């Protein structure tokens, strides 16, 4: 399976609780922080909820 590099680009301040919890579930706590996760449907769904807040890159 491929992996995804997810980077938080926008602040969680002022966002609805669902977006904040999704960021934290992905392991994103600070602006500019990146995490590498497996590319699967669950992670893709979480990214879709907060797509306006994150950048996503495929890592080989």
Swiss-Prot record:
GO terms for cellular component: large ribosomal subunit. Keywords: Ribonucleoprotein, Ribosomal protein. InterPro entries: Ribo_uL30_ferredoxin-like_sf (IPR036919), Ribosomal_uL30_bac-type (IPR005996), Ribosomal_uL30_ferredoxin-like (IPR016082). GO terms for biological process: translation. GO terms for molecular function: structural constituent of ribosome. It holds the Pfam family Ribosomal_L30. Part of the 50S ribosomal subunit. NCBIfam families: rpmD_bact (TIGR01308). Belongs to the universal ribosomal protein uL30 family. This is Large ribosomal subunit protein uL30. It comes from Finegoldia magna (strain ATCC 29328 / DSM 20472 / WAL 2508).
């Amino acid at each position: 399976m491929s992996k995804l590099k997810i980077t938080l680009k926008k602040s969680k301040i002022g966002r609805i609780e669902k977006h904040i919890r999704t960021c934290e579930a992905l392991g994103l706590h600070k602006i500019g922080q990146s995490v590498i996760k497996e590319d699967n449907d669950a992670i893709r769904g979480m990214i879709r909820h907060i797509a306006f807040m994150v950048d996503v890159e495929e890592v080989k």
